[in-house]
Amino acid sequence: MDRKIRVAAIGDNCIDYYDSLNESYPGGNPVNIAVYIKRLGGESSYTGAVGTDSFGKIMISAIQNKGVDTSHIQVLDGKTAVTHVDIVDGDRVFGKYEEGVLADFKLREQDISFIKKHDLAVTGIWGMIEDELPLISKEIPVAFDFANKFANPIVEKAIPYVTYAFFSFDEESLNEFRQKYHSMGLKEKENCTEQLKEFMKAMQQKGPKVIIATLGKNGSIGYDGNSWYRFGIIECKVVDTMGAGDSFIAGFLYGILNGLNVQDSMEAGAQNSAVTIGYQGAW
């Protein structure tokens, strides 16, 4: 893996504020992925929006200090997004979310031209760039983190333009998953795993080259239209699960872009997650 791959991370960012600790950490799905790509040895950029408050300056400075290209961050009048977080038994629990200036974020022509110069673009369900995906996907592959928002309308809107699709399957999203599953008219299956696989097959046929479902402590499942893949987790001490999913995505994409197959890329994702959950905060 000696080729310097270049990944454009686009969309939301937020300050993760731990109320009980009175500590704040810069983060957000695409921001985290950009930082992890750098940690793995690649090149990355982040395109998004921050406010004119102190958190905006902290966000830009923190990303720059990790070596990520911040030349296309928009500074908009207002407040930077904040997510309130707490730690309960090693797991993060989300509280109030304040969107701030992200509500006004939109890609400009110069941003799209910049993004197209990368090897891959990665964004997510809160990235607000689904309207630009047809343009971007004509030039470079797109990775999209749909998180556990199975029934969100953005899923159907974005999926045809996505090369690598990621979903997160957990107890919290079980009802939403079943709602989406039945709305698609898919066959009843004997258990959740079989239903998830049926869903993944249906989604993969809508456009993605590969679809991955992360299962928390149960590892991940992958499907490429021909074969199924499964990988567990790398055992490690859990300090904070913040960034675990984003670490997996970054590790997987870094592996794929450097020529690894799906199975080995899933292992690379798990290894990267194990590093991240061993310390406080996403990075």
PLM features: residue spans?
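Structural motif
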Residues: 6, 119-120, 164, 210
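Histidine-anchored nucleotide/phosphate-binding helix
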Residues: 30-39
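Conserved beta-alpha-beta core of the PfkB/ribokinase-like small-molecule kinase fold
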Residues: 120-198, 217-220
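Conserved phosphate-binding/catalytic region of the ribokinase-like
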Residues: 1-6, 180-283
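Short, hydrophobic/glycine-enriched beta-strand segments
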Residues: 6-12, 143
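Active-site metal-binding loops of divalent metal-dependent hydrolases
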Residues: 12-13, 126, 247
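A short, aliphatic-rich alpha-helical micro-motif
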Residues: 115-116, 159, 205
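Conserved N-terminal subdomain of the carbohydrate kinase-like
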Residues: 4, 15-20, 24, 42-120
